[in-house]
């Protein structure tokens, strides 16, 4: 059995994502960091960016956040975000709509053009792979 870590992403409007992941990559305020099961406990502030969720079948899901905090334990990652958009769906049109919502959310929260370009490239690349 694979070692999976539990992930929950919560905003003031409610739960955006809940599930298990093999790897979670978070946009920490000091840079991206990855979390696997058994990671040392920590609390980190998060900047606007993408949470990359690698599922047990090696597929990826993306959640765009504007900012927030992450609490990491050996078995669970809890993210409290000011705003978040899950970038996914069952059809190309749904994915495209959510991708635009995510881009709008991130644009509204960041003025760093290099960070924006990097975040948008990551989102576009993930959508092309699906």
Curated annotation (Swiss-Prot):
Naturally occurring in which organism (per UniProt): Campylobacter lari (strain RM2100 / D67 / ATCC BAA-1060)
Keyword NADP found: no
Membrane topology type: Peripheral membrane protein
Keywords: ATP synthesis, Cell inner membrane, Cell membrane, CF(1), Hydrogen ion transport, Ion transport, Membrane, Transport
One Pfam family from the record: ATP-synt_DE_N
Gene giving rise to this polypeptide: atpC
Purpose: Produces ATP from ADP in the presence of a proton gradient across the membrane.
Subcellular location: Cell inner membrane
SUPFAM superfamilies linked: Epsilon subunit of F1F0-ATP synthase N-terminal domain (SSF51344)
Family annotation (PANTHER family): ATP SYNTHASE DELTA/EPSILON CHAIN, ATP SYNTHASE EPSILON CHAIN, CHLOROPLASTIC
Entry's family note: Belongs to the ATPase epsilon chain family.
A cellular component annotation (GO) from this entry: proton-transporting ATP synthase complex
Listed GO MF terms: ATP binding; proton-transporting ATP synthase activity, rotational mechanism
Description of how the protein assembles with itself and partners: F-type ATPases have 2 components, CF(1) - the catalytic core - and CF(0) - the membrane proton channel. CF(1) has five subunits: alpha(3), beta(3), gamma(1), delta(1), epsilon(1). CF(0) has three main subunits: a, b and c.
InterPro entries: ATP_synth_F1_dsu/esu, ATP_synth_F1_dsu/esu_N, ATPsynth_dsu/esu_N
Name of the featured protein: ATP synthase epsilon chain
CDD domains: F1-ATPase_delta
């Amino acid at each position: 059995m694979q070692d999976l870590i539990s992930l929950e992403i919560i905003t003031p409007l409610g739960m955006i994502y809940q599930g298990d992941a093999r790897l979670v990559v978070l946009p920490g305020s000091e840079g991206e960091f990855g979390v696997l099961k058994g990671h040392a406990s920590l609390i980190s502030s998060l900047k606007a960016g993408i949470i990359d969720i690698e599922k047990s079948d090696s597929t990826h899901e993306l959640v765009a956040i504007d900012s927030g905090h992450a609490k990491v334990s050996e078995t669970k990652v809890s993210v409290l975000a000011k705003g978040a958009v899950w970038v996914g769906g069952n059809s190309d049109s749904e994915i495209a709509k959510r991708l635009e919502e995510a881009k709008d959310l991130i644009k509204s929260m960041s003025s760093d053009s290099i960070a924006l370009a990097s975040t948008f490239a990551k989102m576009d690349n993930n959508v092309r792979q699906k």
